[in-house]
Amino acid sequence: MRAVIPYKNENAKSRLSPILSKKDREEFVELMLKDVIKALDDAEVVNIDILTTSAEGIPNDFNGNVTITEPGLNDSINEYLQNANEPILIIMADLPLVTGDHIRKIISFSEDVVIVPGKGGGTNILFIRHPNEFTVKYHDCSFISHCEITDELDKSMHIFDSFLASTDIDEPHDIVELMLHGKGQAKEYAEKRFGSETGKGRVKISHLSKLSGFV
């Protein structure tokens, strides 16, 4: 099997712009990518590919394959799948809470397709045993789309339910989950820039502007 990580560094995570500058966001997404790669390494996934429109922000110590693609997430992944002849794990680069144990469990299921849903109807991870028969459809409500595609292909399916694996870091409030539950480099980065505020409601982040230099 192989793992593939779609990745964007340049001007990434614009929804975090209220709390992180462009430079900070680009550094942050690289650290999240490193955490995802570590989870794959911990699960003993040997073959790891990165799909990206630019090699900017790829960790210097990454030993896998980097494929430069044209813009367009679905087109890039579908072209990759059409050329694949072994099971493929598609994992997003903004999942710093995913662990090696999650990966091992996901690839251990016997079903043809394993789907890890994300927040708001997204798809965080897809494990596809017959990738050249499958077409991804990210954006909008991709979780429903991928369930429907699997059904149309008459393939068996397993939904992997995990809070940590379903938590992608897109919005400022997601940083709270990273600080509470993370263990990797992205968490360390966040803790240097944010504090937490507790009260009667949910935990909120507070910006440590003097530490981050954010304006």
Swiss-Prot record:
Q: Which Pfam families does the record match to this protein?
A: CofC
Its UniProt entry gives the catalysed reaction(s) as: (2S)-2-phospholactate + GTP + H(+) = (2S)-lactyl-2-diphospho-5'-guanosine + diphosphate
Q: Which SUPFAM superfamilies match?
A: Nucleotide-diphospho-sugar transferases (SSF53448)
Q: What class of enzyme is it?
A: transferase
Report which superkingdom the organism of origin falls in: Archaea
Write the record's keywords in alphabetical order, separated by commas: GTP-binding, Nucleotide-binding, Nucleotidyltransferase, Transferase
What is this enzyme's EC? Answer: 2.7.7.68
Give the record's pathway.
Cofactor biosynthesis; coenzyme F420 biosynthesis
| GO MF term (any one) | GTP binding
Q: Which GO terms describe its biological process?
A: F420-0 metabolic process
Supply the HAMAP family for this chain: CofC (MF_02114)
Subunit composition?
Homodimer.
Give the similarity note: Belongs to the CofC family.
Explain the purpose of this protein.
Guanylyltransferase that catalyzes the activation of (2S)-2-phospholactate (2-PL) as (2S)-lactyl-2-diphospho-5'-guanosine, via the condensation of 2-PL with GTP. It is involved in the biosynthesis of coenzyme F420, a hydride carrier cofactor.
What is the recorded name of this protein?
2-phospho-L-lactate guanylyltransferase
Where does this protein come from, organism-wise? Answer: Methanococcoides burtonii (strain DSM 6242 / NBRC 107633 / OCM 468 / ACE-M)
Q: What phylogenetic lineage does the species belong to?
A: Archaea, Methanobacteriati, Methanobacteriota, Stenosarchaea group, Methanomicrobia
